[in-house]
Amino acid sequence: MYKLVLIRHGESTWNKENRFTGWVDVDLTEQGRNEAYQAGELLKEAGYTFDIAYTSVLKRAIRTLWHVQDKMDLMYLPVVHSWRLNERHYGALSGLNKAETAAKFGDEQVLVWRRSYDTPPPALEPTDERAPFNDPRYAKVPREQLPLTECLKDTVARVLPLWNESIAPAVRAGKQVLIAAHGNSLRALIKYLDGISDSDIVGLNIPNGVPLVYELDENLKPIKHYYLGDQEAIAQAQAAVAKQGKAG
């Protein structure tokens, strides 16, 4: 049996402001930093250790990983930073308040943009300052692979090559792997691991800063998964994530 630990970054400044973030590189709030430290404490108390970690190239995930490593005294851990673990790109919605967007376009439309599998938000113009083409962190990524918007289906297609070529081989080699990433890049991976249908994935909400443990068989198929921590508080956090895109 193998174990894999996933963690969504702690609360970011735009999570707090209920804004669509995507590839915009916002930082953690004080609460987000505390969530990351608490995650590290939970993992340490439960006896976990790691051989390698994976994260995105966005600072909210990177700092979350730092705080977990710090709490676990694992600052020396090898870390792979990959754009493939970035949050889903929200296109022209990037920076907009979710509730205000729902008031303008309707809860149903925003739910489709946020949670449907194959409907992306409106795309950015290539000349938009939010487009990734001139960002130095993507200088080595072929331009045609850089998105101007994404649906979850696109995010799955972006994440899976990293899983197949790097993460899964590390797990099979017996390495203890930690992934610190984002709500939708983790939803993409979980959809693949658990075989969740395109329609059911709408209902999957991942709370900030809570370790999610997957126990996998020899074929890397999930045996079970569970969050570490106060289960009632985790359920409340998941419900709060689900409500973010509503006008009320």
Curated annotation (Swiss-Prot):
InterPro entries: His_Pase_superF_clade-1, His_PPase_superfam, PG/BPGM_mutase_AS, Phosphogly_mut1. Coiled coil: none annotated. Pathway: Carbohydrate degradation; glycolysis; pyruvate from D-glyceraldehyde 3-phosphate: step 3/5. The record marks H182 as: Transition state stabilizer. Its EC number is 5.4.2.11. Keywords: Gluconeogenesis, Glycolysis, Isomerase. PROSITE patterns: PG_MUTASE. One of its GO terms (molecular function) is phosphoglycerate mutase activity. It catalyses: (2R)-2-phosphoglycerate = (2R)-3-phosphoglycerate. The active site is at H9 (tele-phosphohistidine intermediate), E87 (proton donor/acceptor). It comes from the Bacteria. GO terms for biological process: gluconeogenesis; glycolytic process. Substrate binds at residues 8-15, 21-22, 60, 87-90, 98, 114-115, 183-184. The keyword Isomerase applies. The keyword Isomerase applies. Gene3D superfamilies: Phosphoglycerate mutase-like (3.40.50.1240). HAMAP family: PGAM_GpmA. Homodimer. Catalyzes the interconversion of 2-phosphoglycerate and 3-phosphoglycerate. Belongs to the phosphoglycerate mutase family. BPG-dependent PGAM subfamily. This is 2,3-bisphosphoglycerate-dependent phosphoglycerate mutase. It comes from Burkholderia cenocepacia (strain ATCC BAA-245 / DSM 16553 / LMG 16656 / NCTC 13227 / J2315 / CF5610).
